[in-house]
């Protein structure tokens, strides 16, 4: 006897930094696997080969976080941030900003510097994340229609790039 949902179409979306990988499972069998170069670096990267000076997220939050590090006497981390900023690679800056939420030194000082929460609280910034996910889902829908697949019953997201979903909702 088939398990519940075994006959439905399921889509697994693995979002990395540089690519998004999609697996379509239909009637319990893997039917289609594809990958495309539209992933987390699309949101947080340098785009069109510019540098971090043109990245809106870096520009908006670098001074805020630098000031938080200075105010809380976290000069070592401030120096690391300056070093990362000097390299002008947006993905490195963004990765560092995300890492601060779990940084041992920051936790030891009982300071909260949570870049993901800052983004979640930024109503304008959320639109970028929404558009990113809508673009991925739209691309998958067009692909599935072209290949003759039914609308999926479930869609799962995995990979480091999928963590930005938490900016939209913690559920």
Model-based region annotation:
Residues 1-12, 162:
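Nucleotide/phosphate-binding catalytic cleft detector across ATP-hydrolyzing
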Residues 6, 18, 151:
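Short loop/turn elements that form and flank the Walker-type P-loop nucleotide-binding site
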Residues 9-26:
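Conserved catalytic-core segments centered on acid/base and nucleophilic motifs
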Residues 24-169:
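Phosphate-binding glycine-rich/basic clefts of nucleotide- and phosphate-handling proteins
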């Amino acid at each position: 006897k088939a398990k519940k949902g075994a006959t439905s179409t399921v889509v697994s979306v693995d979002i990395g930094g540089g690519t998004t990988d999609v697996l379509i499972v239909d009637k319990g069998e893997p039917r289609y696997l594809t990958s495309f170069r539209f992933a987390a670096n699309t949101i947080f990267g340098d785009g069109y080969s510019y540098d971090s000076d043109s990245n809106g997220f870096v520009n908006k939050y670098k001074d805020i976080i630098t000031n938080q590090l200075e105010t809380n006497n976290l000069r070592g981390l401030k120096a690391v941030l300056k070093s990362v900023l000097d390299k002008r690679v947006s993905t490195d800056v963004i990765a560092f900003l995300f890492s601060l939420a779990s940084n041992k030194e920051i936790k030891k000082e009982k300071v909260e510097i949570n870049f993901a929460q800052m983004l979640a609280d930024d109503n304008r910034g959320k639109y970028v994340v929404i558009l990113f996910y809508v673009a991925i889902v739209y691309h998958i829908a067009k692909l599935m229609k072209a290949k003759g697949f039914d609308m999926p019953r479930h869609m799962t997201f995995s990979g480091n790039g999928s963590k930005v979903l938490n900016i939209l909702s913690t559920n």
